Amino acid sequence: VLMTEVTNKLTAIKPDILIEFRQPYIGPVMRKYGNMFRGVDAPNNAVANKIETTNLRILSQNTAVHSDMFIWRPEENVEQAALQILNILYSVPQLSVRLEDIPEDHLNMIRYWFKYWNNNKHILMDGKFIPSNPAANYPWLSAIANQKQITTLYEDVVVTLDHNAKQIDLINAKASASVVFKLEHKSNAAIKIIDCKGNIVFEKNQN
């Protein structure tokens, strides 16, 4: 009753008010009272942030799920820093790095991935969300919409591509450089490999 009264009074003042709830006191019923859910504290722990935001995505239906604030050390290489973003790609990112303290390649990486997220948020947040194997901490995650598939790999697994997808983004968020995927039928494809700062490192049309 108290939560209903609080919600009603707040929305009467501001109909589009944002009300956030955080783990661990979140469940499907809380969608009645809040329109933002946020993962539990995961300081400098990309894997924990991924697990908690994915758990929330499974429970929250169309309620916006926000990551916990993520940071990294300025002396980390840019690939390691990028993992903080790639592990929460299927939630609303909450960057907590002091931009004036990080090197230029880190800034370029942030610009690239935040632009990517904004351009693809209708897929990442509103598309068909496919989490894999929760017992293994979700070794890959996918989202599909409008004939586009976005799959992020966190472990060395073989990805099966959606046969209806006309564009597929495979994102490598693991320690090894190799990515293995399986096509279910012959197809013509244009292959482009991009580094974590958005630079094209390989491009080929496959007939």
Q: Residue ranges of each PLM-predicted region?
A:
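Active-site-proximal substrate-binding groove within the catalytic cores of carbohydrate-active enzymes
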Residues: 2-206
